[in-house]
């Protein structure tokens, strides 16, 4: 049982979980603001769910291009949705808003040596605004999120839940659940605005619970129930979001869903620009396909 694990590592993880749960409600998007975006008609003048989702896919492409952590992407999405749920953003300004949120997340999470120059980031993103525009928008975003860049994200819960479940398994069974696959599933969910209305803990547990069902890891079912209890997650809420996650992942795996395309970033980097960029910038990562499990 997770709640009675006595190893030092387990106790540290449980302490971290309690701290995250305590902070969870802070620095999250306004649900009422997200609903307004979802209900908006696509007339070219108002922010819509479709435009928001396309912007997040572009941010995911940048994350893959630069080789940044999923945590960076998750925080960028949090910042973007917090801003969009508060402000009436015109579609023509969305690119600058999105890149500003992304850059804030990068500077907050990534090592300083891996942070790209603003000029390089704008060029690779294929935008026409200036560094001054980006810096000005950064300041606006910071003011509207009350200068609170750090936030509790679904990725943090995903890491903790996964680690706690691993502690509950014998060594020979710890490879049954692939964390990279869970990360890819979370990225897919982030590309849909509806999942920003879910509590980060609920979204993370929904993804893990579905994966455990899919891989038939029955020995972890009790662990999921313990995590649900520890996190004070309502059973109906968990079922509701699991169904939405399942639908999202099914659509994401189909040809109907437009996936982030990091390859388009590859072609706009000239030879001169490529030589000027740090080597780590020019690693073209694979598209964020959800990896298959090895039987």
Swiss-Prot record:
InterPro entries, alphabetized: Cyclin, Cyclin-like_dom, Cyclin-like_sf, Cyclin_N
The entry's keywords: Cell cycle, Cell division, Cyclin, Mitosis, Nucleus
SMART domains: CYCLIN
PANTHER family in the cross-refs: CYCLINS (PTHR10177)
Name of the encoding gene: CCNG1
Pfam families for this protein: Cyclin_N (PF00134)
One GO cellular component term: nucleus
Major localization class: nucleus
GO BP, sorted A to Z: cell division
CDD domains attached to this UniProt entry: CYCLIN_CCNG1 (cd20583)
Family, per entry: Belongs to the cyclin family. Cyclin G subfamily.
UniProt KW Ribonucleoprotein keyword: no
Localisation: Nucleus
Native source organism of the sequence: Pongo abelii
Protein name from the UniProt record: Cyclin-G1
